[in-house]
């Protein structure tokens, strides 16, 4: 770090603490905002402050929201009979961007009795008929799915999980063996 530039060094350090930002990128960003475009720097500072102050988890599903209920939970056009279980609010952003799902969500960031009771209350209150698990493929997520399925087996629910397999545009030689195995075993007829 450069002596005598404590504020600049602190900004570089703050950027470098963010995911996927290395030191070189942090220096470029800090320089750009301090020297090349101070207006963008002020806007960024204002937007960060507002996001921290106003964005919170939706009280029902756990998605990012500026209100008690997020736009998804408040949307009357959504299919209120299906509930997609995800690991984080970021997963909701990804699924929404794909425009492949029109139901509700529930963020299961940790498996505990409080979360399970909240999930059960939502299922009963909204008369959910299907739980879709959109979790990262792992032994832990398989155990979580099995546990929830067993716990809620008396609620007349259909349980499903998102398909897994080979991503578009990837050569078979670059696919891990677990994904290739799943793709072969869960292939669809054409």
Curated annotation (Swiss-Prot):
Domain of life of the native organism: Bacteria
Signal sequence, start to end: none
GO biological process terms held by the UniProt record: DNA recombination; DNA repair
Keywords: DNA damage, DNA recombination, DNA repair, Metal-binding, Zinc, Zinc-finger
Pfam families, sorted: RecR_HhH (PF21176), RecR_ZnF (PF02132), Toprim_4 (PF13662)
Zinc finger (C4-type): 58-73
Domain Toprim: 81-167
Gene Ontology MF: a single term: DNA binding
SUPFAM superfamilies on file: Recombination protein RecR
Function: May play a role in DNA repair. It seems to be involved in an RecBC-independent recombinational process of DNA repair. It may act with RecF and RecO.
Family per similarity comment: Belongs to the RecR family.
PANTHER family reported for this sequence: RECOMBINATION PROTEIN RECR
Protein name according to UniProt: Recombination protein RecR
Upper classification of the organism: Bacteria, Pseudomonadati, Campylobacterota, Epsilonproteobacteria, Campylobacterales
